[in-house]
């Protein structure tokens, strides 16, 4: 099972047809933004201060694991500032001209959102530096000895960059962000509120215990919680009367092979491989990727963060180690 096929993968191309539903249930204002209290409180102050001064919000870097709401937060910032937002991603901006076209079309105080900003090419980054710092665009015209540089003034704007790999950003780029926000995995109670709100937006009949059951198995990630909710809805409509209680949610999630800890087939495969094939570790990333037939980037960016955060896996200089908690979860003698 490749990562893209996992129901609980934070990003899943197989579910693009439900993007419309995702947009419908996303919060539009900070008041509706559940969890991440420290981020919400800080951004409320920064936004109000910028509005009082009639200035563009300072450039904002948002980082954290996939599915925690970086894009949602960027759109909320634009809504709160009452400005337009233009969205792109690092891999799309292949040439300096691609970025220049976006920047020159911005209006005063607008937001430019660049997802996966760590994947910007060095050439594009060089164009971004003066734009962020001085609101100026340096463009080379002509070639060879006849080449010359011209400066184009830009209106004040806010760059919002999102990344799952803040450490991969170059220091010059990272230092130009005046505001940095890290999104953490969500608490179960916050996820329960998110699931209940999504159910209300979709017009579903859902008990709080049903929302709790979905939240408990969502790996601390709103995107996964909403995806599981939609599958539980399908189960409730086909196998029941459409009403979602704790028992219905439990049966639906068990059918989806998502266990009580939110682990799916790939999570269990990874942990069991370490315990059964490598004696609990340490095991290197290359060997682990070969053992479970998965890409190294997927293991590092998607599988491992939650397992490490929950105490089932450890990264050491010698490799990955399955913890005592992992052995206890599977009932395996160490």
Swiss-Prot record:
CDD domains per the UniProt record, alphabetical: AAA
Region entry Head domain (RuvB-H), spans: 260-334
GO MF entries: ATP binding; ATP hydrolysis activity; four-way junction DNA binding; four-way junction helicase activity
EC number(s) per entry: 3.6.4.-
Keyword Cytoplasm in record: yes
Binding-site residues, ATP: 25-26, 67, 70-72, 133-135, 176, 186, 223
Disulfide partners: none
Reaction it catalyzes: ATP + H2O = ADP + phosphate + H(+)
Coiled-coil positions: none
Gene Ontology CC entries for this record: cytoplasm; Holliday junction resolvase complex
Pfam families found in the cross-reference section: AAA_lid_4, RuvB_C, RuvB_N
Residues reported to bind Mg(2+): 71
Amino acids binding DNA: 315, 320
Entries under Gene3D superfamilies matching the protein: 1.10.8.60, P-loop containing nucleotide triphosphate hydrolases (3.40.50.300), Winged helix-like DNA-binding domain superfamily/Winged helix DNA-binding domain (1.10.10.10)
Positions of region (Large ATPase domain (RuvB-L)): 4-186
Database matches in InterPro entries: AAA+_ATPase (IPR003593), AAA_lid_4 (IPR041445), DNA_helicase_Holl-junc_RuvB (IPR004605), P-loop_NTPase (IPR027417), RuvB-like_N (IPR008824), RuvB_C (IPR008823), WH-like_DNA-bd_sf (IPR036388), WH_DNA-bd_sf (IPR036390)
Renumbered residue ranges of the record's region Small ATPAse domain (RuvB-S): 187-257
GO biological process: DNA recombination; DNA repair
The keyword DNA-binding appears for this protein: yes
Main location: cytoplasm
Cellular localisation: Cytoplasm
Entry text on domains: Has 3 domains, the large (RuvB-L) and small ATPase (RuvB-S) domains and the C-terminal head (RuvB-H) domain. The head domain binds DNA, while the ATPase domains jointly bind ATP, ADP or are empty depending on the state of the subunit in the translocation cycle. During a single DNA translocation step the structure of each domain remains the same, but their relative positions change.
Family, similarity comment: Belongs to the RuvB family.
Function: The RuvA-RuvB-RuvC complex processes Holliday junction (HJ) DNA during genetic recombination and DNA repair, while the RuvA-RuvB complex plays an important role in the rescue of blocked DNA replication forks via replication fork reversal (RFR). RuvA specifically binds to HJ cruciform DNA, conferring on it an open structure. The RuvB hexamer acts as an ATP-dependent pump, pulling dsDNA into and through the RuvAB complex. RuvB forms 2 homohexamers on either side of HJ DNA bound by 1 or 2 RuvA tetramers; 4 subunits per hexamer contact DNA at a time.
Subunit structure: Homohexamer. Forms an RuvA(8)-RuvB(12)-Holliday junction (HJ) complex. HJ DNA is sandwiched between 2 RuvA tetramers; dsDNA enters through RuvA and exits via RuvB. An RuvB hexamer assembles on each DNA strand where it exits the tetramer. Each RuvB hexamer is contacted by two RuvA subunits (via domain III) on 2 adjacent RuvB subunits; this complex drives branch migration. In the full resolvosome a probable DNA-RuvA(4)-RuvB(12)-RuvC(2) complex forms which resolves the HJ.
Protein name: Holliday junction branch migration complex subunit RuvB
Organism per entry: Vibrio campbellii (strain ATCC BAA-1116)
Gene giving rise to this polypeptide: ruvB
